[in-house]
Amino acid sequence: MTQKAELEQLLRKLFSGQLLAVLGTQSQSGPYGNLVAFYATDDLKHLLFATTRSTRKYDNLSRTPQVAMVIDNRSNKEGDFHEAMAVTVIGNVKEVGGPEKEQFKALYLAKHPGLFDFVQSPACALLKIEVGTYYIVRQFQQVTELHITP
């Protein structure tokens, strides 16, 4: 197995085991962070999340679509310094529309069925991060980059 294939497998395993991520956006006054429920597509090219259009998060994304998302598997114990893994995703956000919307919505809701009413609301936007790079940190300081080709 190639290093790229191993990293992709590692990411899929992490993403399937985590429900929430920290989304970093940028406002005119500075950075802003939120917890979001996410879904990663199997090809790892997109990460999906939902938000209401009336939020600061949505406003920030409308002005500055570049984001960072952090997903990790920490347990909040001492061993995390050497055993936990964190992934920072860098990419651009777009609202999902057109023919892919129903497909992506079904995938997202399969992972987060408790968010059905929220996602079906007309006020809710389903958003996708078009991933540029994954920064994978393991064993405290081992950093690996995985660049995604569109």
Model-found features: residue ranges?
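Short helix-coil transition/hinge motifs at the ends and kinks of transmembrane helices
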Residues: 6, 76-80
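Structured helix-beta-strand junction loops
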Residues: 17-18, 64, 111, 132
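A short, polar/proline- and glycine-enriched secondary-structure boundary/capping micro-motif
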Residues: 58-62, 147-149
